[in-house]
From Swiss-Prot:
Residues 265-275 have a biased composition (Polar residues). This is Coiled-coil domain-containing protein 81. It comes from Rattus norvegicus. Residues 428-465, 539-566 form a coiled coil. GO terms for cellular component: centrosome; ciliary basal body; cytoplasm; microtubule organizing center; plasma membrane. It comes from the Eukaryota. Transmembrane segments: none annotated.
């Protein structure tokens, strides 16, 4: 991946990107393949995945119009580019709204490291540095295609972001099979669906592929001999690299279909490992596929294939279990059918029809817009002509009839004819009657108004008289009240001072004041005594309350001390038990380690034929019918009559 960077920038990359230079292309592809598997598993379980620095894989719900006023609600996967990356490089992406009930999990490097031979730091460094290199490639205005294995291809061309998903992935996520058809039939989303064959196509040299995958195994693999039928003669031919890639692609399509069926048969929560296709590709001997195809790719029904006899099947060695003679002949007579070319032709035809439909639709829309503009233009012309005609008519009318006065003054008005004299007399009588009735009505209204004024004056006079009478009455009552009060004061007036007698020994004032002082002093003494008793009781109660509080505090301190001692004892007991459990676990682990060491030593000293798979080499069986490889068609079931050797009986 770093082969396109200049030498000056490579030294800087070794400081900024310490992980990528130490990894090969195959290792980088393997790491991103594991990342794609993790994202695919999470999307299969209807969960979003956020890749820091790149974007988020999630779902969106959309109502698609299927025609004939029918709508279908689909949930399709989408990729939302990171906002920081979009703002930094000025990228353009369709705005997509994702519902909030779909959980989004971050990229878990620990789970990815458990699935491959790389540790967590290596995977995280590879992902981060690859995204840094991707950001630099975008910054220099270079076209980029980022391939996610099993998911789709993220392409950035002319600062436009587009994510195209594989049909197999959409089918596995949807489960109903309607999502792919709905997206492929709509003009807005038809370019979001990508077939698996298009992903293997040759990319333009101007686009930078992430992560780069070099097919070294395909280039270094020797040509495979394929036996086919050509002109009725049996002869082997060597397939070229292009034919071999087509066959591998056909096998890929069949395997992907099997993967789709297997994935639909299980629930999303149980998918915890890689797909069946990845397991099939990682297997050493199972990855080689022998295909028997005719040179022309077609077979006639009346022609029988002619194959060269082989003593044993050399391409199906699985744990020593070869194919028997019968299964081998059946396998050689069968030929594989690949629908890759037909599927590609069908897709090309569908794309052509879709383009024709789009062109026809655009032409129809353009024709409708032209017709609408022409109709609008004609209507505007009609309105302008009508307005012009109205203006001309108004102008001509004004010119024909100029303004004139509506009334005239005649100096000598001629007399009215005698025919209208009777009507004029009636009109004059009616006018006189109206004038008389109007005059009577005014007189009556004036009389009523005067009467109402007089009534108001009389009523006001009565109210004033009543108020004055009430005022006089209240004044008389107040005078009587003051008079009674003065009479009571005069009546209750105290006695006069005693007469002064000179040289009198008896006191004149304060003769009866001693008894009152004695009573007052007694009251004060009793009050003071009561107050002293209350103060003493209050002081005694305060002292008792203080003693009770001190005793309660002392009891609380003693209880707290006992609880603290009990907690310390329990903590010491817990620590002792924990130490004892740890010591027991250590002893148990030590014993298990010793046992494992003994088992490993015994295994190393054991013979090579210890496992059942090693012993299966002695007993070769056909992998299809489970019979011995020397089977030539005989049956294990005895017939109704069988001749026994050395006997005259027929059983």
């Amino acid at each position: 991946m770093l082969d396109r960077i200049g030498p000056g920038f490579q030294d800087l990359c070794r400081q900024v990107l310490p992980t990528l230079p130490s990894l090969s292309q195959e290792e980088v592809s393997t790491i991103w393949g594991n990342v794609s598997d993790f994202v695919e598993r999470q999307l299969t379980m209807h969960k979003g995945v956020q890749i820091s620095g790149l974007g988020t894989f999630t779902f969106t719900r959309q109502q698609l119009e299927m025609g004939n006023k029918k709508f279908v609600l689909v949930q399709r996967p989408v990729f939302i580019m990171s906002e920081k990356l979009v703002q930094t490089h000025g990228l353009k992406q369709n705005k997509v709204f994702s519902p909030g009930d779909i959980p989004v999990v971050p990229l878990n490097f620990v789970m990815i490291s458990l699935e491959g031979p790389f540790n967590r730091d290596t995977i995280e460094g590879c992902v981060r540095e690859t995204l840094l290199f991707l950001s630099r490639s975008i910054s220099i205005k270079q076209n980029v295609e980022f391939t996610f294995k099993g998911i789709g291809v993220l392409s950035i061309r002319d600062n436009k972001v587009k994510m195209r998903f594989y049909k197999d992935f959409l089918s596995s996520v949807d489960g109903s099979g309607t999502l792919t058809k709905a997206l492929a039939n709509r003009p807005g989303t038809m370019d979001s669906v990508l077939s698996s064959r298009e992903s293997f196509g040759k990319r333009p040299n101007s686009a930078l592929a992430f992560p780069r995958i070099e097919h070294k195994e395909t280039e270094n693999k020797p040509p495979v001999e394929v036996f086919g039928e050509e002109g009725g003669e049996n002869r082997p031919r060597k397939s070229k690299l292009k034919d071999q890639s087509d066959k591998e692609e056909g096998a890929w399509e069949i395997s992907s279909a099997k993967k789709h069926r297997d994935r639909q048969s299980i629930s999303p929560a149980k998918v915890t490992s890689g797909s069946l296709l990845d397991k099939f590709e990682r297997s050493g001997n199972g990855g080689k596929i022998t295909e028997n195809l005719s040179p022309g790719g077609q077979r006639n029904d009346n022609e029988k294939p002619k194959t060269s006899p082989a003593p044993a099947c050399q391409d199906h060695n699985k744990a020593g279990q070869e194919m028997c003679y019968v299964c081998l002949q059946r396998a050689q007579r069968n030929f594989a059918l690949y629908y890759g070319d037909e599927k590609r032709r069908r897709e090309i035809e569908d794309e052509r029809l879709m383009q024709q439909y789009q062109i026809a639709k655009d032409q129809e829309a353009f024709f409708k817009s032209q017709m609408k503009s022409m109709a609008t233009r004609e209507q505007n012309q009609k309105n302008a002509a009508y307005n012009l005609g109205v203006a001309e008519a108004i102008r001509s009318h004004k010119n024909e009839k100029p303004d004139f006065y509506k009334s005239f003054l005649f100096d000598k008005r001629p007399l009215s004819p005698e025919i209208n004299a009777f009507k004029q007399e009636e009109y004059s009588q009616s006018l006189l009657k109206q004038m008389e009735s109007k005059r009577e009505k005014e007189i009556k209204q004036r009389q009523n108004r005067e009467l109402m004024d007089r009534l108001e004056q009389v009523q006001l006079t009565e109210e004033l008289a009543a108020q004055r009478a009430q005022y006089l009455k209240e004044k008389m009552e107040e005078t009587q009240y003051y008079k009674r009060a003065l009479d009571a004061q005069v009546k209750n007036k105290p006695s006069q001072l005693p007469m002064f007698e000179p040289d009198s020994a008896e006191p004149i004032f304060g003769k009866n004041e001693g008894e009152m002082e004695m009573e007052k002093r007694k009251r004060e003494q009793s009050c003071m005594k009561h107050q002293m008793e209350a103060a003493a009781n209050l002081k005694r109660n305060t002292i008792l309350n203080q003693l009770v509080d001190q005793r309660r505090d002392l009891q609380m301190l003693q209880r707290t001390k006992r609880e603290h001692l009990a907690d310390r004892a329990a903590e010491v007991d817990r620590v002792n038990r924990l130490n004892q459990c740890l010591q027991e676990d250590w002893d148990r682990s030590l014993a298990m380690k010793k046992q494992r060491d003994l088992e490993e030593k015994a295994f190393e000293r054991a013979s090579d034929k210890l496992f059942l798979l090693d012993q299966c080499e002695k007993y070769r069986r056909c992998r299809q019918c489970q019979r011995r490889t020397s089977n030539t068609g005989e049956s294990n079931v005895w017939p109704l009559n069988k001749f026994l050797q050395g006997s005259r009986l027929l059983v």
